[in-house]
């Protein structure tokens, strides 16, 4: 089974287009900060016009051994399953399906507290960790928190998994149908 992660490291994954909205630079800056304290292996899956800037940052900060890029894949689940934590760094989102998918795959989530989506999915932080949009130092602290508080984070992840039914389309359709019938 092919892996993009280094052994004996904290395995982090991020999946999303390599564009300004997804703000991968915040993630890379956070990794650059915490790499001095924690052995990290990061896989970013996606394609987009920021790929060159991302590769330059990786090269300029000697992150080649810690950070790998993989082009878009229709099914990122096998890669997400190999990770310890999923990180979303978006400046804004609608309903980030990839966050729901990561939780369904029992991955702990660290996400930006961007307008709409992550805060609701993570129930204000009860189901994962939230950090300020664009704040790589805050993200770095959250990564360290995960590494140092694994049992607590496992409980948060379990809470998030129990909340997933809210986003099940058949469950939502049943609610709408019930409302229509009662109307």
Region roles according to the model:
Residues 123-136, 144-150:
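Conserved acidic donor-binding segment of nucleotide-sugar-dependent glycosyltransferases
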Residues 108-112:
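Short hydrophobic beta-strand element within catalytic cores of glycosyltransferases
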Residues 145, 169-183:
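C-terminal alpha-helical cap of glycosyltransferases
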Residues 138, 145, 152-166:
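A short, well-ordered alpha-helix in the C-terminal region of glycosyltransferases
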Residues 10, 14-33, 49-55, 97, ...:
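A conserved mid-protein helix/loop that constitutes part of the nucleotide-sugar donor-binding site
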Residues 101, 114-125, 129-130:
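Short acidic/histidine- and often glycine-rich active-site loop of Leloir-type glycosyltransferases
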């Amino acid at each position: 089974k092919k892996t993009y992660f280094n052994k004996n490291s904290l395995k982090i994954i991020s999946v999303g287009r390599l564009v300004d909205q997804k703000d991968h630079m915040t993630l890379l800056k956070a990794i650059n900060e915490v790499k001095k304290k924690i052995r990290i292996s990061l896989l970013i899956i996606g394609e987009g016009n920021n790929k060159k800037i991302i590769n330059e940052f990786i090269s300029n900060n000697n992150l080649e051994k810690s950070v790998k890029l993989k082009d878009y894949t229709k099914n990122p689940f096998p890669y997400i399953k190999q990770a310890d934590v999923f990180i979303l760094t978006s400046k804004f989102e609608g309903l980030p399906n990839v966050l729901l998918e990561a939780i369904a795959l029992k991955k702990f989530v660290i996400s930006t507290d961007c307008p709409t989506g992550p805060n609701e999915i993570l129930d204000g932080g009860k189901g994962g960790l939230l950090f300020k949009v664009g704040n790589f130092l805050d993200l770095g602290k959250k990564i360290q928190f995960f590494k140092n508080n694994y049992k607590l984070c496992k409980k948060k992840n379990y809470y998030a998994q129990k909340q997933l039914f809210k986003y099940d389309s058949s469950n939502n359709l049943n609610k709408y149908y019930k409302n229509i019938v009662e109307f």
